[in-house]
Amino acid sequence: FDADVEGFGVNKPGDAIWYVQTVAVPGAEKCSADLYKDMPRSKAHIYDDLMARHWNYWDEGRYRHLFIAALTDGKAAEGVDIVGADAAWDVPTAPYFDTAEIAWSNAGDRLAYTCKPLAGTDYALSTDSDIFVYDRASGRTVNICKPMEGRVRFNAMVHRNTPFPGYDKYPVWSPDDRYIAFRSMATPGYEADKERLMRYDCRTAEITDLTPSFDYHATNVAWADDRTLWFIAPMEGTYQLCRLALPAPDATCGTVDLPKVVTSGDHDINAFTMAGGRIVAEVTTMRMATEQFEVDPADGKLTQLSAVNKEIYDHIRLGTVEKRWVETTDGKRMLTWVVLPPDFDPAKKYPTLLFCEGGPQSVVSQAWSYRWNFALMASQGYVVVAPNRRGVPSFGQEWLEQISGDYSGQNIRDYLSAIDDVAREPWCDRDRLGCVGASYGGYSVYFLAGCHQKRFKAFIAHCGIFNFESMYGQTEELFFINHDYGGAYWEKDNPTAMRSYANSPHKFVDRWDTPILIVTGEYDFRIPYTQSLEAFTAARLHGIPARL
């Protein structure tokens, strides 16, 4: 190959390989050295449309493309760019470039993949990715989500009536190659929508929603046989393994059985593999980094297979994790994890941290984080309070969706309900409460700094949103902010958007009265570092002790 290979997969017959390479797309040049050959040392970037940058990189007119090459005696022939040499988009999709979005059929004659074939402003406004299938024999590609010819320019009114206008990703072939299972979001522009489990019939081109009455995401999908699917779902602050018996090919959505939740317990199943009727899964808890467990497919019993970190655990002290259900201001029950320090003594008093989750649509689960690690925080003598406030998945769609357009509302009250509930404990030192969070959690910290009514003695905000108006012009995936804020700041007749911007944290800095630590990084293009600079400047000019 004439360039680096960034992922590959050999088909089962062993006669073909797909691979991913970054290619320069003619007409999409953004770097001055590419545009002006007589200026090879120039370093300017030139843009006439969105998106200039994405996640953590600038658009330089180079895209990841998917190639297929024949294999003979283990050697690859010249590859064919099945995306198209002039296609200014990525396969697998940006910004994570996950090669799990690419899947060979078991016969090795077809390749399914995810693509979002949009560019410019359309790309920034839309989540409309689709599943494509390339046939090796004919060289023909079919969009199984939109069988009509061509595509329309992004328009909210048009896409509302377009099949599959949201994210469609992660195709997985059934063992007999008749079906493709994939994950799909129904709402255009809503990146945190319910991940439905869909089944495409390659014979009839019919698509069936397999989880219409299941109120949770379906992720990490795998076939056990032609009539059984397994997947992972977030369930009440954990991730569990589920099994779904499939309907007959001519069944309608109304005859689909609910998935069976096979595993249970306070753990996260993060990934799994199946072979010979056995299941091996990666499992974490707040007290255990990833280990391998065998899962009994009948009753979900977990049997630990690996103990990679046993020698380390034998020499450190870990605190305990308690599950607490807190009553919210609107009479709901909210799961809150409480992490206690090692050698916890209820007769003593402990400084306590309120943890604010990012996302905002991310569950506070039994994850082992290598960044925001609750066990590490607790090891320093803190109690950590981690509520699953409004807006997180695993508690049903109503709980998840409430936060959209209401960043400053019920979820903020949920945070205060959690810390107030724990603060009533005699071992909680109410004079030493802190509040910490990253991303949306950083926004939460900034907002709470203006309304906490002297509950907290210190705040830590990591890459948080401070100023909604400047954020709208600085971020890149505008579909996200359009959905979560309700629209742009100039939409004066849009009450949801106007309510969001009226409650931006920067408008309440005059109420700040508590020291704050602000952490940021220049390669965060989702919430640029300028948000942190604005917050730091505002804090210091208001006389608030602050560190950046």
Specify the residue positions occupied by each region the protein language model found.
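Conserved beta-propeller blade repeats
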Residues: 1-20, 52-59, 65-66, 85-114, ...
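Glycine-rich His-Gly loop
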Residues: 22, 116, 284, 355-359, ...
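Predominantly five- to eight-bladed beta-propeller fold
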Residues: 22-85, 99, 114-117, 121-132, ...
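Short loop/turn segments that connect beta-strands within beta-propeller blades
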Residues: 71-75, 135-139, 201-205, 245-249, ...
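Beta-propeller fold detector
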Residues: 77-84, 142-147, 208-212, 252-263, ...
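Cap/lid segment of the alpha/beta-hydrolase catalytic domain
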Residues: 119, 301, 307-431, 438-439, ...
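Active-site-proximal cap/loop segments of hydrolase catalytic domains
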Residues: 373, 378-379, 386-548
